[in-house]
């Protein structure tokens, strides 16, 4: 006790008793505090355990619009928009399979939700998924951020739910109507903004020969080629793909996916 309160002679026996009593009271206070705190700490642990687990955030990707292929050398990216369609998507899938080509399917959310078996078939065949919004509004770039938010993320959920959990890896704005906000939003949710270099113009109603000629003439523009499997009668698209894919191989092209 001398070390804490001075000399033992100053306090004598009384000082010793007081010191012991003080120490005992202090010890009881510590024990009491520990006992009182224990239930609260346990309750906090239980409450934390009861909180729903937060889903892991998808790793963000580059927000710039990609055109390049992930395959080195002379390579093309085949992209298919506006489906899935119960008539034309299976036919497009068959042509791709016959030619050993993988593609990226840019799907409209409600179409994916309406045809989940087709979405799963696309994934099972080794193709990749792309978000093409809920309503395919080509004036997206003139709409407010909250509208773009719903269009992009609601479609993403519809497609992934239909796919059984497969990830949507790209976002293509309808008509190319990207904004800085939509590109960053998509990228923050793991979807690389996806452009195109070659527009087959198959949606304009031209002949198969016109589609072929357009694609052949524009391949020098870059590797990402745009076709459609939804939004109308795509018989000409299917036939054009049947002709173009073997021709592309004869020209020495390989096939990859857009870079992530």
Task: For each feature predicted by the language model, list its residue ranges.
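Signal peptide-directed secreted proteins
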Residues: 205-256
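Stable alpha-helical elements in mature extracytoplasmic
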Residues: 88-92, 115-118, 148-151, 155, ...
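Active-site beta->alpha N-cap acidic-glycine motif
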Residues: 50-143, 147, 151-158, 168
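CE4/NodB-like, metal-dependent polysaccharide N-deacetylase domain
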Residues: 93-104, 128, 145-176, 184-187, ...
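A cross-family glycoside hydrolase active-site/sugar-binding cleft signature
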Residues: 79, 104-108, 130-132, 172-174, ...
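Short histidine/acidic/glycine/proline-rich micro-motifs that form metal-
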Residues: 109-112, 135-138, 174-177, 199-202, ...
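His/Asp/Glu-enriched short active-site or ligand-binding loop at hydrolase and phosphoryl-transfer sites
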Residues: 177-218, 252-260
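N-terminal pre-catalytic segment of deacetylase/amide-hydrolase enzymes
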Residues: 2-78, 85-98, 120, 243-246, ...
């Amino acid at each position: 006790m001398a070390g804490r309160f001075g000399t033992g002679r100053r306090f004598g026996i009384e000082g010793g008793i007081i010191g012991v009593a003080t120490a005992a009271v202090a010890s009881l206070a510590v024990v009491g505090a520990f006992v009182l705190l224990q239930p609260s700490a346990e309750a906090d642990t239980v409450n934390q355990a009861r909180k729903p687990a937060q889903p892991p955030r998808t790793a963000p990707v580059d927000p710039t619009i990609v055109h390049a292929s992930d395959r080195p050398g002379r390579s093309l990216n085949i992209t298919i928009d506006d489906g899935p369609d119960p008539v034309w998507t299976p036919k497009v899938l068959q042509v791709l399979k016959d030619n050993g080509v993988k593609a990226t399917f840019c799907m409209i959310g409600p179409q994916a939700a309406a045809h989940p078996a087709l979405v799963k078939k696309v994934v099972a065949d080794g193709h990749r998924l792309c978000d093409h919004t809920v309503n395919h509004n080509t004036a997206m770039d003139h709409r407010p951020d909250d509208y773009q938010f719903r269009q992009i993320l609601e479609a993403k959920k519809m497609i992934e739910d239909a796919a059984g959990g497969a990830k949507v890896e790209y976002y293509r704005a309808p008509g190319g109507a990207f904004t800085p906000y939509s590109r960053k939003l998509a990228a923050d949710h793991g979807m690389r903004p996806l452009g195109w270099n070659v527009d087959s113009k198959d949606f304009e109603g031209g002949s198969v020969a016109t589609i072929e000629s357009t694609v052949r003439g524009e391949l020098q523009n870059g590797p990402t080629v745009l076709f459609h499997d939804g939004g109308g009668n795509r018989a000409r698209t299917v036939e054009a793909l049947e002709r173009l894919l073997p021709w592309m191989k004869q020209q020495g092209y390989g096939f990859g996916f857009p870079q992530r």
